[in-house]
Amino acid sequence: MGGASACIPLCLLLATARMARPQTPERPVFTCGGILTGESGFIGSEGFPGMYPPNSKCTWKITVPEGKVVVLNFRFIDLENDNLCRYDFVDVYNGHANGQRIGRFCGTFRPGSLVASGNKMTVQMISDANTAGSGFMATYSAAAPDGKGDRYCGGRLEKPSGTFKTPNWPDRDYPVGVTCVWHIIAPKNQLIELKFEKFDVERDNYCRYDYVAVFNGGEVNDAKRIGKYCGDSPPVPIVSERNELLIQFLSDLSLTADGFIGHYKFRPKKFPTTTTTPVTTTLPVTTGLKPTVALCQQKCRRMGTLESNYCSSNFVLAGTVITTVTRGGSLHATVSIISIYREGNLAIQQAGKNMSVKLTVVCRQCPLLRRGLNYIIMGQVGEDGRGKIMPNSFVKMFKNKNQKPMNALKNKQC
């Protein structure tokens, strides 16, 4: 009896200690899509941090309190990499129904903060049947429309004229990890004229790191891209095809620069207009061609010169052939890029700082590509983003002395 009495205080002490022990917070369980509300929360691909499933389409609808805007921050992203994000990707939209697309993301690049124009945002992830990764994880939060801080930018512009600029302009450099989207909307019978007054964005030959992209219409759509810009030379004035333009600015997590300030104004449609030539040219896509006896019996010789073939080609590059595989009379090659002079719709694969493309030589020995050799290659682009090399395509050995005339051609207006 005495022993039992002595146990009572000890048992109470142990029970109290167990109750006082801090509880380990539960890890969120991520499912395919859902309705998310409140001031803040988490969003992630199905099964994160495990591999996301193939052949899936997941949609999350986020709503924060009225009078606030949604701010989305990606903490981690690992999806199948593709230059055009055609296979596995995450789309982010303003609103819930038929909203403007703010951005499309894939690979492992983590974009900056994404800000909706209102209190609703839609996130959609699509995966195909092939390569997968760990997916993504992001946080969303509510912010005051006019108190989002220096890291936030973008918005809907509907006044007859106005200005847009990078965060911190002109006091200091723009910050790292920023994504800004300005959606300019004019009345139906008007167009939009765009001019950059000052421009200084981290320089790169292919504008891979920090860049400004301008699109006809109200969403990020490579088929409607007017140009992609970086460096310290302001783009030439731009005139929209219709009454909407979208401007996207993105900075990565390394170097920054002064940034830019630009102005826009509406103008009547009746004025004669010419849309500026894109920096990254989008040309008509050619259909896939199969080798035929007649086609492959053509004389195998290149036609014309560097100059005469440059503008008629969808893409122009110098590169090293790293792999070749023969399939059904055609040669499929992977080419590591030395320099690219004209990109068109060519799908460029990137691994670190190395870039490569897939090419199909329709008639496998005409023209002849050998592994380990460097070539200047001009050709067309198929619907799959591969380069198409025909018997009369311009292909020649690339030597260092070719660099100067090729750079001169790169500045040529076609």
From Swiss-Prot:
A GO CC term assigned to this protein in UniProt: extracellular region
Glycosylated residues in this chain: 354
SUPFAM superfamilies with a match to the protein in the record: Spermadhesin, CUB domain, TIMP-like
Ranges of residues in domain CUB: 32-143, 153-267
Glycoprotein among keywords: yes
Domain NTR per the UniProt entry, residue ranges: 296-414
Post-translational modification: O-glycosylated; contains sialic acid.
UniProt-recorded Gene Ontology molecular function terms: collagen binding; heparin binding; peptidase activator activity
GO BP field: cellular response to leukemia inhibitory factor
CDD domains listed in its UniProt record: CUB (cd00041), NTR_PCOLCE (cd03576)
Compartments, as annotated in UniProt: Secreted
Broad class of the protein's primary localization: secreted
Cystine bridges: 32-58, 85-106, 153-180, 207-230, 296-363, 300-366, 311-414
Keywords for the protein's UniProt record, in alphabetical order: Disulfide bond, Glycoprotein, Heparin-binding, Repeat, Secreted, Signal
Signal sequence region: 1-22
Subunit structure: Interacts with heparin with high affinity, and type I or II collagen.
The protein's role, per its UniProt record: Binds to the C-terminal propeptide of types I and II procollagens and may enhance the cleavage of that propeptide by BMP1.
The protein's name: Procollagen C-endopeptidase enhancer 2
